[in-house]
Design a protein with these regions (language model features):
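A conserved mid-domain beta-alpha-beta active-site/ligand-binding segment of alpha/beta enzyme cores
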Residues: 84-109
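Short, small-residue-biased leader/transition segments that mark boundaries at the very start
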Residues: 1-8
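Generic structural signal for well-ordered alpha-helices
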Residues: 9-13, 69
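Two-component system phosphotransfer/interaction surface
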Residues: 60-74, 156-159
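N-terminal [4Fe-4S]-dependent radical SAM core
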Residues: 122-167
Length: 167
């Protein structure tokens, strides 16, 4: 993260202590798992860990952001939002990760280009929202970043509703 992003994150946490921070958009989507950063010329961890955010909404977020809002509005803690397609979450509980493909550990990806290639290939093969599996990668043997399958695309009717909004 750059200084301004860290400043904003810190001010949000300071001002709104109990408000979940959910990130999305192109940067979060492309950096949701371990990735090569061209600016620094090195491998980086998931932006979920480095940003201090609670959750990532990746890809087209029209469905997932509404589901996240509904879950939070119903009283669910952000740490319990682990089931929404199009999201990435972090956990320390390996036993709670089910029906998922384990990617090479972050430390392995750092040390071995072939491990990164395997990870990237697995991610690439799981981009179709109709057949994709849940993926996860391990950090330091005790922290897990879990990517749920991509959100389903909008129907024509849903697309019309979204683009009829006054923005």
């Amino acid at each position: 993260l750059v200084g301004s992003e860290m400043f904003i994150r810190d001010r949000l946490r300071q001002t709104y202590k109990h408000t979940p921070i959910i990130i999305g958009g192109i940067e979060a989507s492309l950096r949701r798992l371990a990735h090569y950063d061209y600016w620094s010329n090195k491998m980086k961890r998931s932006i979920l860990l480095d940003s201090g955010a609670d959750l990532i909404s990746y890809g087209m977020g029209e469905h997932s952001i509404v589901e996240i809002a509904d879950a939070l509005n119903s009283g669910l803690a952000v740490s319990d939002i682990t089931f929404i397609d199009g999201t990435v979450y972090k956990t320390r509980k390996r036993e709670d990760i089910y029906d998922a493909i384990e990617l090479p550990h972050y430390e392995e990806v750092l040390a071995d280009k072939a491990a990164y290639a395997r990870s990237f290939y697995t991610q690439y093969c799981n981009t179709d929202p109709f057949v994709a599996k849940r993926l996860f990668e391990t950090y330091d043997g005790k922290l897990f970043v879990v990517q749920n399958p991509p959100a389903k695309p909008l129907t024509q009717s849903e697309m019309d509703q979204v683009y009829a909004l006054p923005y």
